[in-house]
């Protein structure tokens, strides 16, 4: 039996998250088409560098998933103070380790990773300045990944999606196109646009969490689950 209320709750959390991911993919696809106008070397650098970013993101995703589970447990027990402290603690850990990884992997291991895919010196030269941009970008990205996952855990799902649409298409794309095309910075300009988006959303998400704007959603989430649990317990006792 499919319960409409359960499906509604699933979609209320899942659809905004899917919308956010769709927005990111569309933005990245559009900017990749822009990179294509810079030539084959820029496209090759973009592809290889994106794989390197994936190595750094593995740590961010693991911290975010663990934090999401712990935060949801605290909210389910109506321990909002513990949920808040856990999130802030995870953010501190994430920023420190991501900063270390984003410095060491691109700056120290970047040549080794790139040499696996290519020996073209033009690719190395084009990627080098992007390494420095990634140090700042990954700090913003860790804020997004950890906090957005935790906001979903407490039922605050629409705000991250709306901010993703506004920031990606209102910051990342315009800045990337302006710097990359108009200022002739090429691939570096595009990645500065990505960096501006990640940092903008990261600061906004951190502000939303610290101002407790997520608490009303957490309270609604708790009340809804409390009522379900109460009905289930009552049904068992009959």
Residue ranges of predicted features:
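Transmembrane alpha-helix boundary and packing residues in multipass membrane permease domains
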Residues: 17, 21, 29, 33, ...
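Small-residue-rich hydrophobic transmembrane alpha-helices
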Residues: 45-110, 141-164
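Short runs within selected transmembrane alpha-helices of multi-pass transporters and secretion channels
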Residues: 61-64, 134-153, 159-175, 190-206
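Interfacial/gating helices of multi-pass transporter permease domains
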Residues: 6-13, 17, 33-54, 122-129, ...
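Short alpha-helical transmembrane segments in multi-pass integral membrane proteins
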Residues: 1-14, 71-137, 180-238
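Helix-terminus/linker motif at the lipid-water interface of multi-pass membrane proteins
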Residues: 22-55, 73, 78, 113-121, ...
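Hydrophobic faces of transmembrane alpha-helices in multi-pass small-molecule transporters and flippases
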Residues: 2-30, 34, 55, 59, ...
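Hydrophobic alpha-helical transmembrane segments in multi-pass membrane proteins
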Residues: 17-32, 61, 93-106, 137-141, ...
């Amino acid at each position: 039996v499919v319960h409409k209320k359960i499906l509604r709750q699933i979609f209320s959390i899942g659809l905004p998250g899917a919308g956010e991911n769709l927005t990111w993919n569309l933005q990245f696809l559009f900017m990749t088409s822009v990179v294509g106008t810079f030539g084959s070397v820029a496209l090759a650098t973009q592809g290889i560098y994106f794989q390197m970013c994936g190595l750094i993101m593995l740590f961010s995703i693991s911290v975010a998933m663990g934090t999401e589970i712990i935060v949801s447990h605290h909210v389910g027990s109506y321990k909002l103070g513990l949920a808040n402290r856990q999130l802030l603690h995870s953010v501190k850990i994430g920023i420190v380790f991501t900063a270390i990884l984003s410095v060491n992997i691109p700056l120290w291991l970047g040549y080794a990773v790139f040499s696996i895919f290519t020996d073209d010196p033009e690719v190395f030269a084009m990627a080098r300045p992007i390494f420095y941009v990634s140090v700042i970008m990954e700090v913003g990205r860790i804020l997004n990944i950890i906090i957005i996952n935790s906001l979903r855990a407490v039922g605050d799902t629409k705000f991250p999606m709306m901010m993703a649409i506004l920031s990606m298409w209102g910051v990342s794309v315009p800045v990337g196109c302006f710097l990359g095309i108009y200022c002739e910075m090429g691939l570096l300009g595009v990645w500065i646009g990505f960096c501006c988006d990640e940092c903008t959303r990261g600061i906004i998400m951190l502000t939303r969490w610290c101002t407790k704007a997520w608490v009303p959603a957490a309270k609604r989430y708790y009340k809804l689950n409390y009522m379900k649990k109460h009905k289930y317990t009552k049904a068992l006792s009959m």
